[in-house]
Amino acid sequence: MYNHKTVEKKWQKYWAEHDTFKTGTDPKKKNYYALDMFPFPSGKGLHVGHPEGYTATDIVSRMKRAQGYNVLHPMGWDAFGLPTEQYALKTGEDPEKVTKENIANFKKQLNKLGFSYDWDREVTTSDPNYYKWTQWVFEQMYKKGLAYEAEVPVNWSPDLGTVVANEEIIDGKTERGGYPVYRRNMRQWMLKMTAYADRLLEDLDDLDWPEPVKEMQRNWIGRSEGAQVTFKVKDSDKTFDVFTTRPDTLFGVSYTVLAPESKLVQEITTPEQKEAVDAYIKKIESKSDLERTDLNKDKTGVFTGAYAVNPVNGKEVPIWISDYVLASYGTGAVMAVPAHDDRDYAFATKFGLPINRVIEGGNLEKEAFGGDGKHINSEFLDGLNNEEAKKRMIEWLEDHNVGEKKVNYKLRDWDFSRQRYWGEPIPVIHWEDGTTSLVPEDELPLRLPHATDIKPSGTPESPLANLTDWVNVVDENGRKGKRETNTMPNWAGSSWYYLRYIDPHNDKELADYDLLKKWLPVDLYIGGAEHAVRHLLYARFWHKVLYDLGVVPTKEPFQKLYNQGLILKNHEKMSKSKGNVVNPDEVIDEYGADSLRMYEMFMGPLDASIDWDDNGPASTKKFLDRVWRLFVNDLDLKAIPQEKIVDENDGELDKVYAETVKKVTEDFEALHFNTAISQMMVFMNAAQKAKTIPREYAEGFVQLLAPVAPHMMEEIWSVFGHDESIAYAKWPEYDPAKLVESTVEIMVQVNGKLRGKFKAAKDSDKDTLEKEALALDHVQKFLEGKDVKKVIVIPNKIVNIVAK
């Protein structure tokens, strides 16, 4: 009997002692970088969802090593951030201690699964030797004007005691904890991601990423072309700009809308409307951007009492405020054309505002018309279609100095301040004379000071503000200053960790340029689709900044991205609160790591969400036990006697072996592991039925299965008499000629009725086939006493004998 407990421990110990998976550096070999999205080391440890993506990259890494590549396959920890801090607050423990314990537990669990990580390259984002370089990147951004301070409307979560980025809000609540979010103005550090909007958009085209992820990034960046138009406020010297993608509809404007928080609102509101305007502003101040811009919500708004003048026809139109207009998006003001825009139509219908048609088409009694058509009621645009009218209107606006062609983005700059303790300190000092300076590079890392009270202060300061010895500084001239007390978001360290794996112990620079040139971009990156517009966008942004600084040699970090699906339990996402988490340790204990790895790869396509079956690992264990019994004599743990595994080849397994090597290699490359495993099962069935198995095929099959079930295959490999690990044994190849059957079955008919069949060499000539057919005993029975008049032979198919 195969004992997974002893065999798995034995090989895990062997790999660790022999540094089996140390990253290769042979200059003659090609390089391959297989990366997992590193985990946040929570106290809960791994559940069976984690190993799915990890097993996939591990299989590819193991195959690539055997194919003669230098393989970089590292692992590390995304250790800063809210979850650890929340846990530490609840239990009173030190977040650093909690993090170290969680990492040790995670690492133990990962090693039990037999992953081929190079642990010499392990990184932890909360390690000062690591975040020294996170701070260094921030400093370079500051010097380039890409990191700046601003008073901005933010998403404030009192329950978390911090600001959260737009990307961290789901359905109007914080992604972490599901707490309500309120809008307020605060001084924040911002990263100028908008400066890279066009490149972030354009360079997506060159990436081998799932189309839905690319589409999510495109929508998040939200590039739109149109015009910026200046409206004057009636009876005043004030003006405001609107951005519109439909400048061709300017003649149809019947009102304008300002963001309620716009400074202009207070300046233009009439005394009669002031009370209503102030009440409305108070009512909406706690709403998040997402709530405010929800297309399905009821439209609300208030008239300011003021009017704007339409620059194209001099008509006066009322100025309203409404929460669907955001101060942070576009210009914070919109022109409304209810006849040709759904949102404007709903608003105008509710508040009884005019609906002026300027394009032919549709039924305005029922709904707005957004399609193409001939322009009407539009003076110099009459008779033109949409695109021609847009161009013509932009020319007119530019000629009259009341507008210009403009590109707008939905993407905002990245809110980079968090009012929490457990994060990278921002290396900035605010001086009493009002100036700001960076902590000198040679003094980095600016270490996070130890603190016992890490409760959020509930103010725009983080708990670091209480550590006065750390906060207060004096320069050599006696000038007093205070350190920045906000910390970086937990997305900071994960925006560049894949670079540090390439050169993890370098204390002179982030990573050596020549090494980066060898390994970048990442060849395969596997992780969850939930990171589409956060981590994956942030990392691309940082990478482009570093490219411009000459730190990295490529424009993009990750060439191929793949999202694994979720593993569900009872059709629901696994979570502690639902009590449906399956712990991999228990599965490994009962069935072995190889069975778990194989089951997770065999469940279905890697990118599908699939329900966990408690009997699944038992069925893959059954298959692996069959493999064991085919090759190993359980009594003495020696290879099966010579009569089954032989040095000669009778050709019986040629075709199925060639098919198996071909399909498994191609399917591993394409990440189609379930179909690769099915093909290995086909080979197993054939091998069990065969009288003998050529040694070359037995060993080749074990090598193909090794990336999926490495422990058992290492053991069988050593039983076959090999002293070295299977990890670097040359990957099997196949003879394409053997994909075609070397023999064919020939049907024999006598007077049109099937009377026999025989096997013959493929493409045998007619004479040979005729002789063979006539010699069959069963056929001769039907020819007794008859004369053979004619023999019709169709090579490779049939011999038809006509006899009378």
Curated annotation (Swiss-Prot):
<dbReference type="InterPro" id="IPR002300">
    <property type="entry name" value="aa-tRNA-synth_Ia"/>
</dbReference>
<comment type="similarity">
    <text>Belongs to the class-I aminoacyl-tRNA synthetase family.</text>
</comment>
<protein>
    <recommendedName>
        <fullName>Leucine--tRNA ligase</fullName>
        <ecNumber>6.1.1.4</ecNumber>
    </recommendedName>
</protein>
<keyword id="KW-0963">Cytoplasm</keyword>
<dbReference type="GO" id="GO:0004823">
    <property type="term" value="F:leucine-tRNA ligase activity"/>
</dbReference>
<dbReference type="InterPro" id="IPR025709">
    <property type="entry name" value="Leu_tRNA-synth_edit"/>
</dbReference>
<dbReference type="GO" id="GO:0005829">
    <property type="term" value="C:cytosol"/>
</dbReference>
<dbReference type="Pfam" id="PF00133">
    <property type="entry name" value="tRNA-synt_1"/>
</dbReference>
<dbReference type="InterPro" id="IPR013155">
    <property type="entry name" value="M/V/L/I-tRNA-synth_anticd-bd"/>
</dbReference>
<dbReference type="InterPro" id="IPR014729">
    <property type="entry name" value="Rossmann-like_a/b/a_fold"/>
</dbReference>
<keyword id="KW-0436">Ligase</keyword>
<dbReference type="InterPro" id="IPR009008">
    <property type="entry name" value="Val/Leu/Ile-tRNA-synth_edit"/>
</dbReference>
<keyword id="KW-0067">ATP-binding</keyword>
<dbReference type="InterPro" id="IPR002302">
    <property type="entry name" value="Leu-tRNA-ligase"/>
</dbReference>
<feature type="short sequence motif" description="'KMSKS' region">
    <location>
        <begin position="573"/>
        <end position="577"/>
    </location>
</feature>
<keyword id="KW-0547">Nucleotide-binding</keyword>
<dbReference type="Pfam" id="PF08264">
    <property type="entry name" value="Anticodon_1"/>
</dbReference>
<dbReference type="GO" id="GO:0005524">
    <property type="term" value="F:ATP binding"/>
</dbReference>
<feature type="binding site">
    <location>
        <position position="576"/>
    </location>
    <ligand>
        <name>ATP</name>
    </ligand>
</feature>
<dbReference type="Pfam" id="PF09334">
    <property type="entry name" value="tRNA-synt_1g"/>
</dbReference>
<dbReference type="GO" id="GO:0002161">
    <property type="term" value="F:aminoacyl-tRNA deacylase activity"/>
</dbReference>
<dbReference type="InterPro" id="IPR009080">
    <property type="entry name" value="tRNAsynth_Ia_anticodon-bd"/>
</dbReference>
<dbReference type="Pfam" id="PF13603">
    <property type="entry name" value="tRNA-synt_1_2"/>
</dbReference>
<dbReference type="InterPro" id="IPR015413">
    <property type="entry name" value="Methionyl/Leucyl_tRNA_Synth"/>
</dbReference>
<keyword id="KW-0648">Protein biosynthesis</keyword>
<dbReference type="InterPro" id="IPR001412">
    <property type="entry name" value="aa-tRNA-synth_I_CS"/>
</dbReference>
<dbReference type="GO" id="GO:0006429">
    <property type="term" value="P:leucyl-tRNA aminoacylation"/>
</dbReference>
<feature type="short sequence motif" description="'HIGH' region">
    <location>
        <begin position="39"/>
        <end position="50"/>
    </location>
</feature>
<keyword id="KW-0030">Aminoacyl-tRNA synthetase</keyword>
